[in-house]
Amino acid sequence: MSPESWKDQLSLVSADDYRIMGRNRIPNAVTKLSGLETDDPNGGAWVTKPKRIVVSNQLPLRAHRDISSNKWCFEFDNDSLYLQLKDGFPPETEVVYVGSLNADVLPSEQEDVSQFLLEKFQCVPTFLPSDLLNKYYHGFCKHYLWPIFHYLLPMTQAQGSLFDRSNWRAYTTVNKIFADKIFEVLNPDDDYVWIHDYHLMILPTFLRNRFHRIKLGIFLHSPFPSSEIYRTLPVRDEILKGFLNCDLVGFHTFDYARHFLSCCSRMLGLDYESKRGYIGLEYFGRTVSIKILPVGIHMGQIESIKASEKTAEKVKRLRERFKGNIVMLGVDDLDMFKGISLKFWAMGQLLEQNEELRGKVVLVQITNPARSSGKDVQDVEKQINLIADEINSKFGRPGGYKPIVFINGPVSTLDKVAYYAISECVVVNAVRDGMNLVPYKYTVTRQGSPALDAALGFGEDDVRKSVIIVSEFIGCSPSLSGAIRVNPWNIDAVTNAMSSAMTMSDKEKNLRHQKHHKYISSHNVAYWARSYDQDLQRACKDHYNKRFWGVGFGLFFKVVALDPNFRRLCGETIVPAYRRSSSRLILLDYDGTMMDQDTLDKRPSDDLISLLNRLCDDPSNLVFIVSGRGKDPLSKWFDSCPNLGISAEHGYFTRWNSNSPWETSELPADLSWKKIAKPVMNHYMEATDGSFIEEKESAMVWHHQEADHSFGSWQAKELLDHLESVLTNEPVVVKRGQHIVEVKPQGVSKGKVVEHLIATMRNTKGKRPDFLLCIGDDRSDEDMFDSIVKHQDVSSIGLEEVFACTVGQKPSKAKYYLDDTPSVIKMLEWLASASDGSKHEQQKKQSKFTFQQPMGQCRKKA
């Protein structure tokens, strides 16, 4: 039964916060949306249409109160990405927005406002009280998460706030409020939910808890830090598991995705794989897909502004104002990561080193209002003003020339487009940024329009040109292959880039411009949204092909996805099949299957030896231990089981019974690769306390079960990567198992053991097995299960007589499971008892026949 972890989450919310969440503060949305349901043409009552629910911290709305009527007025914010992405959805798709309003609506007005916004704008507002909003947004999001996700640890108060448990509770509370509002408009069987950004990273856990099959994606618009930075978060696991409760996780760049995958590997022990261009994380039977795609801009919006006469008039005024100057442009938010001061210093150095540029080059810096308040913002603003004043006083000239024109405050999109139009170069040198679309907007503007061309005096012989100087630490950098990439911390490099932009030929500028414009125009916001939406649909298509079970409490909740036919192996199922068969093959893993993983003494007990002998004494049985262990310990441990077969080192060595010799795999015995692998493993053994190396005849294994769990898993992943790199040209495979990293020859696997044994039984006995039991517990045993499914000889056995069984209720290729090692032993006892009973019945019949039929009469009858 699924644990009720939803209720347990209230323990993370204080009593005061919970009272804030009362109905009088958060009105319900109307649950039936216009256009959401239609008449069924086949006579049914209603047919639901799948809709997209776009969830973000703020709704794509502008709000103000009309002074004369004292009523609220709302309009869509055309600059909002969340509104623009609608263009990427299929036609006639219902889109519902869930988020906060950038307005303080009185509690008495909230119900009416909610109703109005839902009916007129398809928006569901989450009204957050000011004290809760302050702790959630300013306290946790902007002053704690934002710096860390931009690689800045809170070493001092000026570098961000320390972790505050009350702010974390506020973050949790707000995410819970968002979940409640989503539930009011959600059809969990059909709708797709798309969550945006770091403000709502634990929201997926609340949603997945309530509806296990919800179709859910998240896109992170900020950077994702390296694991060394991220692991400092006291709530790192809760946030990671929030991401993993999604079906699709999106990032702007591969670097951000790589850091996320590294965190999942090092902190949660999860592995990922790339198949046919898709990256997926296996998480308790679910595949969490990873999407890497930078967002684009809304081409139509920029084109319409370019065509406006108002824009042309603004361009004319700016052109007159900066007549005779070469204009470079910067457009940035006011925060500590945008590198504005570094840009100004580079500008000062450019003028210091190039006297001929003084009086000619102007850097126009537009600074958008800060999204948060605090001493850090004030310090940044103060520093920028001081540097600008210093450079202007040093290089300014009488008549009004100032090398730095600092525009600090809100600037309309129209005015920004006008500045883009007159600028020869745009400089974006943030020290860390999620995406930054300024270069995109600049490039599209520089492509021109009839109105802009007339305002700029653009002639028929003139060529389109633009130059972009971009920091290598921002999301758009990989997409702009023609940009001049710089390290913003290297002032000399930024200065040289500015100088190159001034001296670059028009032909070169045109080539770079055309290259960028082609990419930007084809990878717009609609393309981005459409691609994400299609991948989200693909990631969710198997939801109803599996059974989902809820596991865990609070923010550690997850679902386990299992095959619908996956079930516990019961005696009522296997014993009758065992009794009616005459040629049986029984394959048993050892560690974790018949011997508990946590047991220090791995030798089999006398009871286990006795049990195996009972099974082996049945002439209808062929019983094999199939293990990754070496042949010497297995041979020694099971010496008292004369009829037991052993396949050691994953099948490299095979022995049919204690009297038969060891057979070796037919693969070439080239073990020279050990000279390469051993020093690497030794290095990791010395660096990882508690780890050790096991050297087999055909393989080498690095064990870390006695090391620190987190560090051991981390080192295992690093060792795996290292060995795969140095052994690329060797005939081996490198695999991770349960607390191990193993190197073994190619073509050796437990799956090959299954094929070999069945083929041998067919060739020697003239018949295939009519009963097959295979039990294992880890990744290497999945090869056996896979071989059972695929091997053509096995497919001829009736499905009811094939029993592939894993240990533990977990995702597996096996059809059955047993809970633990004692359950395995108990099941084998059932089979042994069935064999004992058959033998007893046979002896009883034989004894009865001899007593009733004297030998002479038998001969006579014969």
Curated annotation (Swiss-Prot):
UniProt region (Glycosyltransferase), positions on chain: 50-538
Enzyme Commission number: 2.4.1.15
Annotated keywords: Glycosyltransferase, Phosphoprotein, Transferase
Modified residue annotations for Phosphoserine: S5
Residues covered by region (Disordered): 838-862
A GO biological-process term: trehalose biosynthetic process
Catalytic activity: D-glucose 6-phosphate + UDP-alpha-D-glucose = alpha,alpha-trehalose 6-phosphate + UDP + H(+)
Record-level Gene Ontology MF annotations: glycosyltransferase activity
Gene Ontology CC terms, in alphabetical order: mitochondrion
Pfam families: Glyco_transf_20, Trehalose_PPase
Gene3D superfamilies: Glycogen Phosphorylase B, HAD superfamily/HAD-like
SUPFAM superfamilies: HAD-like, UDP-Glycosyltransferase/glycogen phosphorylase
Tissue-level expression: Expressed in leaves, roots, stems and flowers.
Family: In the N-terminal section; belongs to the glycosyltransferase 20 family. In the C-terminal section; belongs to the trehalose phosphatase family.
The protein's name: Probable alpha,alpha-trehalose-phosphate synthase [UDP-forming] 11
Gene encoding the protein: TPS11
